[in-house]
Structures are given as C-alpha cells and as structure tokens.
Amino acid sequence: MLSFYYGEECPHCHHMMPIVDKLIGEGKEINKLETWHNEENAGKLEKADGGRCGGVPFFHNTDTDQFICGAANESRIRDWADGRKSE
C-alpha cells in the first residue's frame, strides 16, 4: 500500500500534491491522508513513521517499507511508488 501523509497548510506538501495526483492519474493507488486536522490520520502517521521523520510530507510504501521524509523530486517519488530504491 502506498500512503502520502500531508498537512492541509503545509507548503512542502502542496508542492508534492501535483506529483502524487499525476501518479494517481497514471493508475497508482496512493492513499492521501491529511494529518493536521484529522486525529485518526495523525495516529496512522505516527505509527507508520516510527520516529524516523517526525513530520510531513511523509511517503510510505508498506509493501517495501520504503519511506521518504519531506519533499522529493518526481523521479524519487516514482521510484518509491514502484518499489525501487532511489539513489
């Protein structure tokens, strides 16, 4: 499962949203979970993060346990979504 955790007012998250939406449009199933105004999603983020990053944006691929802390370029996000390790 692919999850993108974000905050509604987070500028870095807003920068990532077009890339995430593009991948969704191409058929990737990515769960978008707002965490700043949704306590349930905030709890999911805390569990998924496990103290590795401590904030948003946070990308987690549960199939590979790969994660990205913070903003990243499209190539890195694609690698994450495809389960490939990025350089």
Question: Each PLM stretch: what is its role?
Answer:
Residues 1-31:
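Local sequence-structure signature of Cys/Sec-based thiol-disulfide redox active-site neighborhoods
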Residues 10-13, 53, 69:
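Disulfide-bonded cysteines in secreted/extracellular proteins and peptides
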Residues 35-46:
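Structural microenvironment flanking redox-active thiols in thiol-disulfide oxidoreductases
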